[in-house]
From Swiss-Prot:
This is Isoleucine--tRNA ligase. Belongs to the class-I aminoacyl-tRNA synthetase family. IleS type 2 subfamily. A motif ('HIGH' region) lies at residues 48-58. ATP binds at residue 628. It comes from Treponema pallidum (strain Nichols).
Amino acid sequence: MYTPVDPKVDFVAQERRILAFWRERRVFEQSVAQRAQGKSYVFFDGPPFATGLPHFGHFVPSTIKDIIPRYQTMRGAYVPRRFGWDCHGLPIEHLIEQELNLNSKSDVESYGVSAFNAACRSSVLRYVKEWQRTLTRLGRWVDFDNDYKTMDVCYMESVWWVVAQLWQRKLLYEGYKILPYCPRCATALSNHELNLGGYQDVSDPAITVRFECTSVVPGSPAAREFCAAASWGSASLPAHTCFLAWTTTPWTLPCNAALALGPQILYVLIEANDEHYILARSRLEFYYPDSSAYRVVWEKRGEHLAGIRYRPLFSYPVFGQGPDPSVQGDSEEGLFCTRVADFVSTEDGTGVVHVAPAFGEDDYEVFKDAGISIQCPLDAECRFTAEVADYQGLFVKAADKAIIARVQKQGALFRREQISHAYPHCWRCASPLIYRAVHSWFVAVEKIKDKMLAANASICWQPSHIRDGRFGKWLVCARDWAISRDRYWGNPLPIWRCVHCGATDCIGSRTQLYERSGMLLEDLHKHVVDMVTIPCACGSVMRRVPEVLDCWFESGAMPYAQQHYPFEHATDFERYFPAHFISEGLDQTRGWFYTLTILAVALFERPAFENCIVTGLVLASDGKKMSKALRNYADPNEVMDRYGADALRLFLVRSAVVRADDLKYSDEGVKDILKTVIIPLWNSYSFYVTYANIDGIDPPVCAKVDGMGQAVTRLATHLNNPLDRWILSLTEKLVQDIACALDAYDVSKVADPIVSYVDQLNNWYIRRSRRRFWKSINDEDKRCAYNTLYCVLKRCVLAIAPVVPFITESIWQNIRAADDVQSVHLADYPVCTPMVRDDALEFKMETVQRVVSMARAIRAQCNLKVRQPLKAMQVITRNPMERSALLEMEEDVLDELNVKELVFHEKEDEIVEYRAKANFRVLGKELGSKTKRAALSIERLSSAEIQEILEGTTLYLDVDGDRLELTEEKILVQRIERESLKAINEGTLTVALDTTLTEDLLLEGAIRDLVRGVQNLRKERGFSLVDRICLRVFSSDQDIVCARKAYDLHRSYIVGETLAAHVQWARVRDGASAVYVKSDAVLWEVSIDKA
């Protein structure tokens, strides 16, 4: 006997019981240990920060990161699942700064680096318990006890080894480049971090500035073009001519060094209001909408205008060139003259770009090889330094107003406006970033770019477009990676520099540091290693450079550092690298996926992972980003406590988010999965257990459902009922579909087969087989029904266990055989048995279901419920296989639709008349202006002619002398039902119902309504499925004649359907309560009692 099943189970409470079962029996640990001799399957888990609580963005990859390892484990693989924590970097530093009220780097240093790092260490894992509790509640199996932390000394040492390897391979260098810089965090960021913080719309001042031309550089293109030396004032070069340059960063004007022109852009010199300006021809209309307001003097391409000198707006010593930098340098290599650059565009502004090489990557490239010393006159918090004396100490963005005022006072302000544009912000503190020239240490990514592209080509991405799309394109444009940060709580960059000769060296281990310094350290953090000095060959000492590593470098090194490689696992590293599988969100194409790839290729010339599932972004239901401030989403823990984790998991993997698209989350989606999958599956299981207990059925002969499916094959050979063979075939299809999807790492194809299968099992197989379980005789057909339902339930549970682990465990615990493993997650995954698949039978049942669906649609249109019998259904099909299927399964069709007769016709025109209209979308391409005349001819086609076209015969029409070949796709066919018939067409099938209702049909429908009412009454009274009843039936006075007639005709049907031991035509006894059941023909009066 099975434990009785509550059909109204509390899934949330049940899931908590399963969690307790897993915990007490250590089922996860068993699942890993029992496969220890199996093939090793490597899974890398990207380390999250534990400084915040998990949210929906973590739930999507976490679900996938549970499904795949569960599946691989059931397939026999050894799959350790070690969790990890990202402990260093800006996230925790920013949090601690807020808590300690430290507002700048100077505040941190005043507080003390050692104390600050101690505060970071003590707080970095503050939400670990919440993470463990939440992910465990989701059903995710992962090893928290053996987790790795990026702040552990062994992890940090392996990261040092990685840095040393890059150093030895000449892939690490020190440089000075333009990088995005956070003034709040006072450190540079990598280009790949820009997308992590996102772009926000901001309003900035945009000004157009006059730069007055003074002369031309001898030998320059401009000198050749104008045949001028140093003078400016000829007819073609009027005095006081100005270039108009546009900028959205007025604060960079004190550092202006040049004006950039597009070499192929057409520029004009115009005269307007006795003034002369040079700007791009295509931008004239924006600045001068009235063309009569100016006169064009000449037009020239930018390449001919290089070398025109202009008067600088400011003369601050920011270029190391002396008091008058405008006269320094040879020809056009000097400052304050025009230069050509390919980055100049005419999408906005004037087509003339103000160049400040200390504040723009393109600007910096203009002067990269000019031999001019570029200085950045900003301090660590982006305030002007003494070089820009007038604005010293002022934050650059705050200086905009004063600088604009000064430009206006000088008469150089041509136009001022306010613009809104997208601007990058810091990914941790959300401050606007500043592009500025900074010192940093770089990984020479561009040297290995081709190898990275080759590695990417070997990776299986899901969705596949990521490989050559978002990730591949990012790799094509990959630039050297700035890995140093001017911060405190991080892994120190292990490079020492001599204070005297400047020699540098990289340390790759604690042992090497001990050998060089005599100090063996158990903590490698900044406040410790900064105290360690190393003797230099020159006789002086080497001190560590001050920077720490980008935390993304540490997460990219996790394949090696989590194993303490190469200090441990040096001989069996191939067992742990590369990963067979990883999964994270789309943003990690710029983050973890990228850093993993860089380091794996740099160290081993291979990818770090073989398969990657990329997920999209989970948005609130209104399409906005989920926000605590806006309160526009539910806590995911509350969702699980309302609907259960299984429903949430299946909802997520069925959504677009697993295809790297955005998901607008709504509780309704989870609720729908609960109603359409979880509850129906439970009902199927409940049905089996309930009737098996009634009949005393123990687990059938096929109880041991082994992975190879021999028992299923044996069962299939003994089944005669098509329904049994069909659901068995469909179960094997489910197994095959899920396995194929998971083998291909395409989780987007996992959910739909489950949804479809549960619907077929519950709403077709069990419903169509219900009478076989009801009957009192335990004959062969009944035994086959039990064996089949048991077998398919068990194989279904095994197949979907990785996806919905809770409900499958609950079912398994009750229906497993005595010699089965104690948990479904310790079992082998079922292997599809091709011999059991029956494609022909699946097609036949699909055809039956199509016809049933079409006929039900007709009933709905005519307001005819299925309990109302109908005389006949007419069917026409142009597919002989469909006709054969319907003939073979005619009894099922008639019973399902409550129709007395199934009539086949050869031609559709036997039940409908045709009318046709032109398909303008198709004909318009062929006939053009003659289409309307062809349409008139098509509307005059007879029903017989249209029938010929539908049967494949080609007709021809004469359209103004042109011969039109008329085929089915060129016409739109309307079907007009003949009298009393209602028809519907779908592809090769046409179905019609005779909706005429005779007295006998109406009476039989009334009896079916009566039976339905009695069944509902049994449920309301709490009667069991086997309880026999005493039934009294009567009717209202006005219906009594037809009611009694219906009762007499169908009394035996009433008895059989309601389990009535006694049935009487009589009024309800005095004192008893009557229930009234309404049908279209009769108002029934009913009372029941247990027999």
